[in-house]
Amino acid sequence: MQGEAKRDYPASIHGQSAWYRQYRYVEDYYARIHLLMEQGQPLCDVLVINPVESLWAGIYPGWADGLTAADPAVGAVEEGYRTVFGSLCAAKADFDFGDEDMLARLGAVESGPDGVRLRIGKMTYRTVVVPKMLTMRASTLEWLKAFGEQGGEVWFTAGRPEYVDAQRSAQANTIPGLDRELADVETALI
């Protein structure tokens, strides 16, 4: 170990702590919040596809300089992801990140009285936002295509991926969806 980490002495939760007797008040407060939050069902209508597999596809010797992407394509994916995150947070939009693997294993498209929704596990979404991606899994493509064909909203904020399963393909152009600028996404979600 080097640097600060080997000199880190976090406070303990034992009798030698000066605030040990008062610690119960803090933990009781958190326990009450936990109980309250556990009773509800989260409601989030926006899913942002995580482009992590595009980043993994762009890794090769020399792809990065420290923590900075040296490859402009990888840098563009990172910047697109950061911009989508910042824009949605600035618009105070509630959203979840969706992993392509979880979508492949747990995904389903459902129609109900409140319209078509994309289900991943226990959560359902009305809108899927696709940030800058280099490649997309074929399974993700099929789920988004089925979702869009049934009336679900799919928004591409930086164009369509040029690769499917890391192979050059125009299949992403078959997904019914809107190519939207981030400003349009922010406005639509407010």
Q: Where is each model-derived feature located?
A:
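Carbohydrate-binding surfaces of carbohydrate-active enzymes
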Residues: M1-I190
